[in-house]
Amino acid sequence: MQFIKSLIFNIFLYFGLIFIFILAIPTLILPNKVTIFFGRLSAKYIVLILKLVMNTKVIFHGEENLKKVDNFFVASAHQSMFETFALQIPLDGPIFILKKELLNIPLFGWYLRKIGSIAIKRETTTKENLNFFDKIKERLEKNKRPLLIFPQGTRVKLDEQPPFKKGVGRIYKALNLPCIPVALNTGKVWPKNSFMKFSGDIHI
């Protein structure tokens, strides 16, 4: 039964996202706020099918903390693909710091470029690092939106606790902005690299 539910969910997930991304193609030449709308729409769509197909409820905690500061960046745990979409709901179109490879994915990568996402290289020189921080500052001043980074660098299993990458500390020092950490349990419902999805509440 769990396999059947997972199969139905994945069909709705991928075909639904492809449909939304195709609808969003014209937004690539429109203002960012229109593109961001479709990003949040895709997140809400996933939340909906999680509820309808998997009987999974998504609960956001601490959203009031986002209103206490004007400028900040968010450092989130990373257990599944889901939070890359879901965090667009409370953050309303964050600026992603992500692996360069993600920008090369058709449709998805185009959207990430349009909303001002910043690619990070695994191995960088000191000069490249300085240019990277300058780019972040410029992007934040221009867009007035929060920065979102996944300091673990990749998705991890629910019971794993790999060390955080040093980059988040460097960003914290370079930007001199408050950091809002995000804990979650998405790996319980949506395990890393797994076809199977499971029922249960998601807490972010």
Predicted regions and their residues:
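Residue-level preference for the first positions of well-ordered beta-strands
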Residues: 71-73, 144-150
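Short gly/ser/thr-rich secondary-structure transition/capping motifs
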Residues: 53-61, 129-131, 187-189
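A cross-family acyltransferase "interaction/gating" segment
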Residues: 108-110, 146-147, 157-204
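Active-site metal-binding loops of divalent metal-dependent hydrolases
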Residues: 153
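A membrane-cytosol interface segment of integral membrane proteins
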Residues: 113-144
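N-terminal membrane-anchoring alpha-helices
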Residues: 1-57
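Catalytic core of membrane glycerolipid acyltransferases/transacylases, capturing the structured
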Residues: 21-32, 36-40, 53, 68-125
